[in-house]
Amino acid sequence: MAKKIVGYIKLQVPAGKANPSPPIGPALGQRGLNIMEFCKAFNAATQKMEVGLPVPVVITAYADKSFTFTMKTTPATVLIKKAAGVGKGSAKPHTDKIGRLTRKQMEEIAQIKMPDLTAADMDAAVRTIAGSARSMGIEVEGA
């Protein structure tokens, strides 16, 4: 018989920096899960990633106080800001342009995001990334 699922916990945790402080500690503690066990497992799973990049994670909590977790790819907005070299998006995205993204940079981001996107092919994924960039006030070249 399969384990009974008691809930899902969705968090964004910096790669390699999981610790028992909020938001991780309280979220896992409410379900009675071992916080340090998650932190060690998450940090081990993200050790090959760039430290500090936010990683969305979905933790499945079971009735016997055990858990599993699945990691998603880093949010597209974070990757776009990093590639464009800006700190945050424009306050007026369609009038004030704050950066520029080339087709090659968008293809690299789309390659990273491909497992989480619903795009059928690379060109559709690049168009999705281009749309996100435009809505942040970043100029898009060749899309």
Curated annotation (Swiss-Prot):
GO biological process: translation
Pfam families: Ribosomal_L11 (PF00298), Ribosomal_L11_N (PF03946)
Record PTM text: One or more lysine residues are methylated.
Annotated InterPro entries: Ribosomal_uL11, Ribosomal_uL11_bac-typ, Ribosomal_uL11_C, Ribosomal_uL11_C_sf, Ribosomal_uL11_CS, Ribosomal_uL11_N, Ribosomal_uL11_N_sf
Role according to the record: Forms part of the ribosomal stalk which helps the ribosome interact with GTP-bound translation factors.
Family statement drawn from the similarity comment of this UniProt entry: Belongs to the universal ribosomal protein uL11 family.
Name this polypeptide is given: Large ribosomal subunit protein uL11
Gene: rplK
